[in-house]
Amino acid sequence: LAMFRLFRINYFNPIVKIFATYLEPVSKSIFFFLNPLLAALALSLLLKFVSFYIAYSSGYEPLTLFFISVVDVVNSCFRILFYCVIGSVILSWVAPGNNHPLLQIVEEMSDAILQPIRKFVPPMGGLDFTPIIGLVLLNLINTSFIQIISSMV
């Protein structure tokens, strides 16, 4: 839900409506003092922290588990974006212009990542190299973030 809000995915999409219907009341009731984007992120962090605390409560301090949950949530977000970009590349070959709701979400999320890169890298000879650059940048940012947070723990 946080990624749908962050990338401004169309809320008339049936899949987004289902997620919003079930997850928005939970995040609003627990984190009523935050805006909806931060509430959804806080809910995902809380759920990840509770799952790690239940699994590893005897071996780690709670602050360490919190940092591990932050790293895992951010890593999951980057993996989703990574696979959305790969999915949009495959879909552009296989089924361009398909109106399936899930495919629309994949296209909108990958376009949000690739659109700033397309401003700097024009298509060369009919080939679009922005997905390759986007995947490299996503991997670089994810790896550097994980190393920075891991060094803090």
Spell out what each predicted region is.
Residues 1-153:
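Selective transmembrane helix interface/packing segments
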